[in-house]
UniProtKB/Swiss-Prot annotation:
Pfam families: GIY-YIG, HHH_5, UVR, UvrC_RNaseH, UvrC_RNaseH_dom. Keywords: Cytoplasm, DNA damage, DNA excision, DNA repair, Excision nuclease, SOS response. It comes from Saccharophagus degradans (strain 2-40 / ATCC 43961 / DSM 17024). Belongs to the UvrC family. The keyword rRNA-binding does not apply. SMART domains: GIYc, HhH1. PROSITE patterns: GIY_YIG (PS50164), UVR (PS50151), UVRC (PS50165). It is found in: Cytoplasm. This is UvrABC system protein C. The keyword Cell membrane does not apply. The UvrABC repair system catalyzes the recognition and processing of DNA lesions. UvrC both incises the 5' and 3' sides of the lesion. The N-terminal half is responsible for the 3' incision and the C-terminal half is responsible for the 5' incision. Residues 21-99 form the GIY-YIG domain. One of its GO terms (cellular component) is cytoplasm.
Length: 612
């Protein structure tokens, strides 16, 4: 009988004899051919030799070296180009021993279109394909929406979609409440609209002082011309601008720059960025990088800067970046960014006056956010460990999935799956399922369909299975879940039903096990709090999905029963009038102006919509 053979030991001596001293990138693989680590080096031979010395390795680096079975190297013309390649490989392959960012979503911008008489103002995220002006980046979507709301109130530039704008025959509600000048019906001239648009762009460029001076002159000219209505409008714009400016920290003479600070505690790191545009702090954002090796704050900051500013066209790179630590590869990072983006970048760690204050703000924010994260993580870990004790498990669950079903009287059923680990919710792994082909209101069949689709997909993709699955329901739902799991041949997955109890109040839940046993937890149980948190999130996610599906159906359901009005005509009506409410308000003559709608059909539509 053959015995299991251990994997062969990597022959580092033979390998290192043939390694070049040129700059480049190296990739380390384990016995299964899976990527372990990606690194760069100015001198590949010296850098790779350092992994195989007899002493001086950190415990985690030693653990990495023990798993190495193969190393591939790629020579590059310079260390800067090695940094660019390293960044791309880390992003695409996600090696487990590299520092990885959790949030890689592109940043939002404000967009002003070009090439039309009445350009629009809009939220934008993603590649900059459309022709126009992009302002940003902003730290998050909320900051963009808050700014758009202010601009709509102050300068009244349109923010509607082009399809709605082109199809309107009368002003919308925004015009009626004084938040739009009505360009869709030419209630404002192209010339006057261009002035409002220019003022909007000046504000977004951070030129508030110059803009206020222009508006002051315009207000005085309007008063002298006895155009008091216009003078009042401009006066209100000046007032709004001054109120916003009073809330900002200003420093004349400084151009656009980012302030990046790194703080660490208990082996966890936090990066915080302040975005300064035209001397004004326009926003901030925190990151919690995953660190697998014994990384210093300098290591983490260096890796972050390379990842962040080589992240593609969605990121605007300012000419100056203030950093909290002096880095050995500061110049290399700047050179790599310049090669990748064509923009010069200067990194500075030694600053004074207002820039020193900005750096202090960023450091304090990093420390505070890190403290909050550690507190939250400790709470989560304690809850996971409590759940382990309650269930008598040998190991703490690492991944928990929870399912819920939502519908209205059995219609438009939606199933949800949420995922938690000891770091909290993994929203990128959340999934929704539109349920079809079951009897209305049959929650058991709905749950069976959701679980079958979910775990058939995970099996097909060879994706990670959860350690524990929570089913929102009692013995009936749990038995369906058990049957699905057994049918799919899945083992080592614990199933638990979460029954709400007779009172259906939080704190009185009963845990139902597949053995038929039940557990009632104390109201102050940390395990119960974790289950409630996950179950409530699954419930929220299911309800949100159901409401979205229901609202989408309602937007067209009123028109579905009209003879001769199929999907194409329904869509044309909604686009022409800008929404269902406008269709309902339209008279027969208005309806007849829509594409493909004759006078006779317009009368038919009107009769159906207004019949009692």
């Amino acid at each position: 009988m053959s015995q299991h053979q251990p994997p062969p030991v990597f022959d580092s001596t033979s390998f290192l004899k043939n390694v070049t001293k040129l700059p480049g990138v190296y990739q380390m693989y384990d016995a299964d051919g899976a990527i372990l680590y990606v690194g760069k080096a100015k001198n590949l031979k010296n850098r790779l030799s350092s992994y195989f010395r007899a002493t001086g390795l950190t415990p985690k680096t030693h653990a990495l070296v023990k798993r190495i079975q193969a190393i591939e190297v790629t020579v590059t013309p310079s260390e800067a180009e090695a940094l660019v390649l390293e960044h791309n490989l880390i992003k695409s392959q996600k090696p487990p021993f590299n520092i990885l960012l959790r949030d890689d979503k592109s940043f939002p911008y404000i967009f002003i279109s070009e090439g039309e008489p009445y350009p629009k103002l809009a939220f934008h995220r993603g590649p900059k394909k459309k022709k126009g002006q992009y302002f940003g980046p902003f730290p998050n979507a909320s900051a963009v929406k808050e700014t758009l709301n202010f601009l709509q109130r102050t300068f009244r530039v349109r923010q509607c979609e082009d399809s709605v704008f082109r199809s309107r025959t009368r002003p919308c509600l925004q015009y009626q409440i004084g938040r739009c000048t009505g360009p869709c019906v030419e209630a404002i001239s192209v010339e006057d609209y261009a002035v409002d648009l220019a003022h909007t762009a000046m504000f977004l460029d951070g030129k508030s002082e110059v803009l206020q001076q222009e508006l002051q002159v315009e207000m005085e000219q309007a008063s002298q011309a006895l155009d008091f209505e216009r003078a009042v409008v401009v006066r209100d714009q000046i007032t709004d601008l001054r109120q916003v400016q009073a809330q900002q920290v200003m420093e004349a003479g400084y151009s656009n720059q980012d302030v990046v600070a790194c703080a660490s505690e208990s082996g966890v790191h936090c990066i915080h960025i302040l975005y300064v545009r035209q001397g004004r702090i326009v926003g901030s954002k925190s990151y919690l990088p995953k660190t697998k090796l014994d990384s210093t704050e300098e290591d983490v900051l260096s890796a972050f800067l390379a990842h962040h500013y080589l992240g593609g066209a969605a990121m605007d790179v300012p000419p100056h970046i203030i950093i909290s630590h002096k880095l050995a590869d500061q110049l290399i990072i700047g050179e790599a960014v310049e090669k990748a983006t064509g923009k010069q970048l200067k990194l500075t760690h030694n600053v004074r006056t207002y820039r020193a204050k900005w750096l202090a703000m960023a450091l304090e924010a990093a420390r505070q956010n890190l403290k909050n994260h550690l507190n939250n993580k400790q709470t989560l870990v304690a809850r996971f460990e409590s759940l382990q004790d309650i269930l008598g498990l040998d190991e703490t669950p690492n991944r928990i999935e929870c399912f819920d079903i939502s519908h209205s009287s059995g219609e438009l059923t939606v199933g949800s799956c949420v995922v938690f680990d000891q770091n909290g919710a993994k929203k990128s792994d959340y999934r929704r399922f539109n349920i079809e082909g079951i009897k209305a209101g049959d929650d058991y069949a709905a749950m069976e369909q959701v679980l079958t689709r979910r775990y058939t997909r995970l099996q097909k993709e060879s994706s990670s299975m959860p350690d524990l699955v929570l089913i929102d329901g009692g013995k009936g739902q749990l038995s369906k879940a058990k049957a699905v799991v057994e049918e799919l041949g899945i083992h080592d997955m614990m199933l638990i039903g979460v029954a709400k109890g007779t009172t259906r109040k939080p704190g009185f839940e009963t845990l139902v096990l597949t053995s038929g046993a039940e557990r009632v937890l104390k109201a102050d149980s940390a395990a119960l709090h974790l289950i409630q948190q996950i179950r409530d999130e699954a419930h929220r996610f299911a309800i949100t999905g159901h409401k979205q599906r229901r609202d989408k159906k309602r937007r067209t359901s009123v028109l579905e029963g009209i003879p001769g009005v199929g999907p194409k005509r329904r869509k044309e009506l909604l686009v022409h009038f800008g929404g269902l409410q406008e269709v309902l308000r339209a008279n027969v003559d208005d309806l007849a102006k829509a594409p493909s709608i004759s006078k006779k059909m317009a009368q038919e539509i009107y009769n159906v919509l207004h019949s009692e």
